[in-house]
Amino acid sequence: MKLIMHGLYAICKLAMFSLQTSTAQSVQPDDLGFIIATPDDLFQGGARSETNYGDPSKPGLYVIRITFPPGAGSRPHYHSTARYITVIKGTWYTSWGPKADIYNPDDMLAVPEGTFIYQPPEGHHYDMAKDEEVIVQIMGMGPVITTQIPQPGQ
């Protein structure tokens, strides 16, 4: 297992240098510690997530797949740990960095099927499917905390 993890780490580090740039998401608790998250709080337009391995809220490796129907996407956010993403199906659209603090679907990079993306810890981003269903696979080390970036008027 250690050899596999070291190999995965080396591959991801190499890929990170060639391409840097989403997600079962969580919301933060209120002042009393309660969390109530509707699907619209987590994703816009009905994206759904399944956990294939591990648990993103617990220590250790996790693998999740997110299916974005056409028009579905996440709101601007960031994660506490790095994430390694492969676009399995469709063309995914993403925005990252300071410009990703404000949602603008007209200023996104088209990411074709088969693309690998490394998202560094606390890298601000958002993503979506535009005209077709998109499936992405996300790997990372838990526990991961997702923080939403407040939008103007919220």
Regions found by a protein language model. Name each.
Residues 7-18:
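Bacterial N-terminal signal peptides
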